[in-house]
Amino acid sequence: GGHMNAAGVHCVTFLLMAKECGVEVDEHTLQSSLLQFYRFAGRGNVAYGDGLPEGGMVDNGRTTGLAFAMQAAANLHPDGEQSVYAKARDISATKGFYSTSWLFHGHTGGGIGELWRGQSMGLVQDKRPDAYHSFMDGRRWMYELARTHEGIFGWVSTWNVSYTETATERRGWGNRIPLIYTLPRKQLRMFGAPP
């Protein structure tokens, strides 16, 4: 057996959010998986597999996924925004945001990394407003082109992240693009809305 942390980090987020909603969650599973991922915060990129944190810049969304898990953990912790999990969220979101300045860089043509990069900045926009606005101003053209005439979203590209791939056909993840705009409004609990 092995770990696939790129997917597993979202399972931790789910467990934490389920617990906050009152669902009975196995405490050992929750605590051991939270420990597994918390150890990556501030130490590089979340590893793809069962290993140490990875070096390098491009993380393809893994470290931002960790930031969302840490947001969910901070929501449960009595210290909330003063907790170690809130600090881990900010560190991970900043790392995810600054993971690369290259547009569409990474495997899958970079489309996945671009989805997470904007969302990571949305998590720390209050603490890094200048960086957030610089990012949004610099990428606005790309987000505007991502909206199709049908009202769906997908990256405009001849790579493997084009409209037909991300918006309607085999992959629907292009529809996550609007979260880059809506996340900073903090209307969902995972994005910082009050309970």
Each language-model region and where it sits:
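Extended ligand-binding clefts on enzyme/binding-domain cores
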Residues: 1-115, 122-134
